[in-house]
Regions:
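Active-site environment of divalent metal-dependent phosphoester hydrolases
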Residues: 15-21, 40-45, 68-75, 105-110, ...
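Binuclear metal-dependent phosphoesterase catalytic core
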Residues: 2-5, 91-94, 115, 162-170, ...
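Short amphipathic alpha-helical segments and helix-helix/interface helices
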Residues: 21-25, 48-56, 74-75, 128, ...
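Short hydrophobic-aromatic micro-motifs
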Residues: 9-10, 96-101, 195-197
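Conserved catalytic scaffold of divalent metal-dependent phosphoesterases
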Residues: 16, 70-163, 222
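Active-site neighborhood of phospho(di)ester-bond hydrolases with catalytic His/Asp-centered motifs
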Residues: 10-12, 33-38, 62-68, 84-86, ...
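Short, well-ordered alpha-helix to beta-strand connector turns
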Residues: 30, 59, 81-82, 134, ...
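N-terminal active-site segment of His-dependent metallophosphoesterases
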Residues: 1-57, 133
Length: 223
């Protein structure tokens, strides 16, 4: 007899726009919601609380992390809710672990939470070092990996993170969900890693991650 299917919805780049809550069909019955970053736009007072409550009312099982457009108070809030994923690891199911790293490399816009490639790489390595044994691994990272289908801006330039790409090449997580580059939603592969950028949540894009009979699968939805 087949095991029950467990499902997680991964999305990001909410930017305080909550229309996605009503257009993602699986949101209520999913085993959890994973948010890769950019919950707010510069984190004005009350913004993260409003986004949290709107999602929580649909599904209270949330893991989330800071993006480059969020300020440090977002991480403080998520830690208070025991939902922070940035620089953390969690076990979603037996043998299935997730690790998260938020922020982004520097942008031309001087957004609140940017770090160097070196720092991003250190964070990835340090977080992975805490993860322990696993059978399959999900990486939730705000910045998309460099030189993929997921990091191309309108002029055709690749603007993703080399550190993220290097980490994926080295560790080969089974599933990677990124974001940050709104106009480059899609999926790609790096080695055996399947990598996804669902785009802005307000566009209805998300990644449906499923676990059935011990096997992780993922599919880009809503794009």
């Amino acid at each position: 007899m087949a095991e029950n299917i467990q499902k997680w919805i991964a999305l990001g780049d909410i930017h305080q726009s909550l229309s996605f809550v009503s257009i993602i069909p699986e949101i209520k019955e999913a085993d959890g919601i994973i948010i890769t970053g950019d919950i707010t736009n510069h984190s004005p007072q009350g913004a993260v609380e409003k986004v949290w409550q709107t999602i929580y009312d649909q599904n209270p099982s949330i893991l989330a992390q800071i993006g480059n457009m969020d300020r440090a108070n977002v991480t403080d809030f998520l830690k208070h809710k025991e939902a922070n994923l940035h620089l953390e690891t969690r076990e979603l199911a037996k043998g299935i672990k997730i690790m998260g790293v938020g922020y982004s490399i520097p942008t031309p816009f001087g957004t609140p939470s940017e770090v160097s490639e070196e720092q991003l790489g250190l964070w990835l390595d340090e977080t992975y070092a805490k993860i322990g044994d696993y059978d399959q691994l999900i990486l939730a990272v705000h910045d998309s990996p460099y030189n993929t289908k997921l990091d191309v801006i309108s002029n055709g330039q690749h603007v993703g993170s080399r550190s993220v790409r290097n980490f994926i090449e080295k560790v080969q997580p089974d599933i990677v969900v990124s974001g940050h580059i709104h106009e480059s939603s899609g999926e790609d592969t790096i080695g055996k890693s399947r990598i996804f950028n669902p785009g802005m949540a307000s566009g209805g894009g998300y990644v449906l991650i499923t676990l059935q009979n011990g096997k992780l699968e993922a599919a880009l939805k809503g794009n």
